[in-house]
């Protein structure tokens, strides 16, 4: 059963939240962060992308960069740009994208739940990325950014959230970079806090939607602090890390598409012939064509869109991995025909997240940068949960969640 707790959030005053809040650290590079921060000294990028305070080209892994993050976090608090709440609260966070709003509960998730598998993952993590995030957590003694969880739909929590959503939020703004709405409510009522804690305690599992490296880093630092504390009792703040938990049915998973630089020595016709072994191939013409259902793919090649429908027998409906379109495309197109065996390291392939649309696939091929593009039907939350429950791991680059969590609305200190 899942254990969560309220915590004393560190957060901006109402009048500063729009200046401080930012996109997450991993959706933009250092130079993009430098441009977005501009001359805004209050931008959270000075804490989560502190290399922007050094000469361009400074490595984000430079020891001075981590130290700068800690110095800036301290300075933000000293200047009153970030203040810690007096009491332990939960928080309700709403995101609005294209007229649709989803509501998450900001909680302290239990480190032991991650270590024992109650918090379920569906992606492999890389040790170098874990270590980077661990250094950031250690030096700040805080989870500056939350991780993104899904939980099974719950009518009690849904009713509680709706009650708060009908009241005036603590924060309410539209982010200038993406046009998405962000709102936050503080749950300080003791009875409501008890309800949230007890409802989570009934849940057999929580699911990481996005933020596998942040989750691993937070849990590993928590375990490290417990091991190094001779007076460890188990109720210390480092036993918890900050997560925003959304009902699974509210979440939108977008398509995560592929662009490839060459056809592995094949002509276009040879490539299409090779695909016909496992797919029904239909030329859809020059107008952009989006996959309409599971096991249908859209190929963009030589100015034309093709529908590729996987033939019966090319996938196993009873295998939670083998039935995924990301697996089918990796096995039968990228590996078998194009010779791309490692999606993480092969320089011939790149990935385009769903919000950028199929127009971006067309642009990258038409420009000559890429030879072909492949659009996939989005993975469903049910598929993600089935895989996590089975203890298996999704293929790389399978899920793209939008909207991304806004960073800087709430921060969790570990002591």
Which ranges hold each PLM region?
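Surface-exposed, charge/polar-rich loops and edge strands
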Residues: 1-415
């Amino acid at each position: 059963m899942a254990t969560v707790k309220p915590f004393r959030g560190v957060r901006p005053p109402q009048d500063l939240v729009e200046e401080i809040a930012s996109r997450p650290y991993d959706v933009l590079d250092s130079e993009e962060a430098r441009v977005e921060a501009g001359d805004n000294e209050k931008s959270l990028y000075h804490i989560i992308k502190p290399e922007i305070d050094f000469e361009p080209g400074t490595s984000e892994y430079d020891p001075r960069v981590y130290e700068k993050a800690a110095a800036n976090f301290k300075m933000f608090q000293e200047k009153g740009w970030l203040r810690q709440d007096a009491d332990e609260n939960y928080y309700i966070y709403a995101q609005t994208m294209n007229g649709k709003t989803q509501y998450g509960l900001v909680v302290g998730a239990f480190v032991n739940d991650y270590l024992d598998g109650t918090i379920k993952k569906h992606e492999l993590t890389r040790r170098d990325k874990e270590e980077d995030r661990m250094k950031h957590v250690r030096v700040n003694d805080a989870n500056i950014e939350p991780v993104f969880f899904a939980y099974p739909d719950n009518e009690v929590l849904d009713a509680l959230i709706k009650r708060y959503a009908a009241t005036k939020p603590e924060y309410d703004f539209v982010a200038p970079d993406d046009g998405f709405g962000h709102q936050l409510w503080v749950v300080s009522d003791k009875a409501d806090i008890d309800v949230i804690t007890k409802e989570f305690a009934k849940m057999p599992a929580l699911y990481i939607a996005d933020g596998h490296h942040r989750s691993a880093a937070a849990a590993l630092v928590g375990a490290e602090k417990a091991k190094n504390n001779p007076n460890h009792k188990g109720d210390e703040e480092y036993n918890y890390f900050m997560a925003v938990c959304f009902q699974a049915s509210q979440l939108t998973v977008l398509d995560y598409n592929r662009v490839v630089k060459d056809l592995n020595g094949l002509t276009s016709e040879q490539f299409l012939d090779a695909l016909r072994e496992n797919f029904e191939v239909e030329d859809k013409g020059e107008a952009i064509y989006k996959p309409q259902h599971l096991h249908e793919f859209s190929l963009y090649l030589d100015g034309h869109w093709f529908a590729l429908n996987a033939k019966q027998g090319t996938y196993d409906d009873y295998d939670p991995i083998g039935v995924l379109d990301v697996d089918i495309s990796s096995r039968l197109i990228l590996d078998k025909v194009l010779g791309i065996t490692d999606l993480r390291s092969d320089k011939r392939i790149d990935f385009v997240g769903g919000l950028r649309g199929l127009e971006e696939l067309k642009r990258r091929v038409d420009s000559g940068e890429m030879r072909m593009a492949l659009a996939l039907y989005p993975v469903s939350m049910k598929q993600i949960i089935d895989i996590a429950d089975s203890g298996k791991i999704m293929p790389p680059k399978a899920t793209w969640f939008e909207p991304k969590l806004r960073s800087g609305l709430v921060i969790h200190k570990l002591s």
